[in-house]
């Protein structure tokens, strides 16, 4: 299965993805995202100026406003 990076505050999402058989990595720093097929972030630390370096070649899913099930569905459709 896919390697999914998930922000550490999203424990319910981490558990749900693990139950679906994905390898879940807790995102603590930018380097954690480099080997991930997909990353799930809270969106709270969005870059206000719109300038950012790409740390991952995989999809990035912003969890803000989504349920755990919706996030899992998005992950499944992107990996």
Curated annotation (Swiss-Prot):
Homology family: Belongs to the UPF0180 family.
NCBIfam families the UniProt entry points to: PRK03094.1
Protein name: UPF0180 protein Bcer98_1118
Pfam families membership: UPF0180
Coiled coil stretches, renumbered: none
């Amino acid at each position: 299965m896919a390697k999914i990076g998930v922000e550490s505050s999203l424990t319910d999402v981490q558990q749900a993805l693990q139950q679906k058989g994905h390898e879940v990595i807790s995102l603590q720093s930018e380097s954690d995202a480099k080997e991930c097929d997909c990353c799930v972030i809270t969106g709270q630390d969005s870059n206000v100026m719109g300038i950012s370096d790409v740390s991952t070649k995989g999809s990035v899913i912003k969890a803000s406003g989504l349920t755990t099930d919706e996030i899992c569905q998005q992950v499944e459709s992107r990996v």
